[in-house]
Design a protein with these regions (language model features):
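An acidic-aromatic substrate-binding cleft motif
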Residues: 1-8, 13, 17
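Aromatic- and carboxylate-enriched substrate-binding clefts and catalytic-loop regions
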Residues: 21-196
């Protein structure tokens, strides 16, 4: 029901796509060896009905692959999961890497760089557009792989939900700092996180 409300809002406000996070099984075991299943929705998320409804309203769905930093688990499923999205008519994908990589590797390590390259190439084979969160720095890869639409790589306003937030100067500096390296996905606001309604 909530998914359809967001699709209706997007259609009414000329928003081209809606991102749904947390629809796939595995969130309750974050960080576990087999935590996320990238093709198995929770029982209350009917992916076929949601895609059908979105298409009827002229809105695209952006899929979400949060890895929690568990790269081996994601790479085992990546090709099949992207094909699964393609089969469902989903061609936009946000990847996420909130969490430590295995064996102490850092996001910007050679291990991380190689992984991101595999993701971009696999997505291209499946004609998927990518938005990477917790990415490596922009390297110009989108010149070779234009399906690499954007990456986060900045402290967005979601930080206002659990911390003192960002000062106003942070937001106005980003166009002159972070954006010099390429397109940026930025979280511009936070919904009511207290759930008072």
């Amino acid at each position: 029901a909530n998914a359809k409300k967001y699709i209706d809002f997007a259609a009414a406000n000329h928003i081209e796509a809606v991102l749904f996070e947390g629809w796939n099984e595995g969130w309750e075991s974050w960080g576990g060896m087999q935590s996320f299943d990238f093709t198995k929705p929770y029982a209350d998320f009917d992916i076929d009905e949601i895609v059908r409804y979105a298409k009827e309203k002229g809105v695209e769905i952006m899929g979400h692959h949060e890895t929690g930093g568990n790269i081996p688990n994601y790479e085992r499923q990546m090709d099949h999961a992207m094909q699964w999205y393609t089969d469902h008519g989903i061609h936009l994908l946000k990847t996420g890497y909130a969490g430590a990589f295995p064996d102490g590797y850092l996001h910007h390590s050679q291990y991380g760089v190689n992984h991101y390259q595999r993701v971009v190439e696999t997505a291209a084979r499946h004609q998927m557009t990518l938005d990477a969160h917790e990415p490596i720095k922009d390297t110009g890869i989108r010149r070779t792989w234009p399906n690499m639409m954007t990456r986060e790589g900045a402290r967005g306003m979601e930080w206002n939900a659990w911390s003192e937030g960002n000062p106003p100067s942070h937001h106005v500096m980003l166009p002159f700092t972070r954006l010099l390296s390429g397109p940026m996905d930025y979280t511009p606001g936070t919904f009511d996180i207290l759930f008072l309604k």
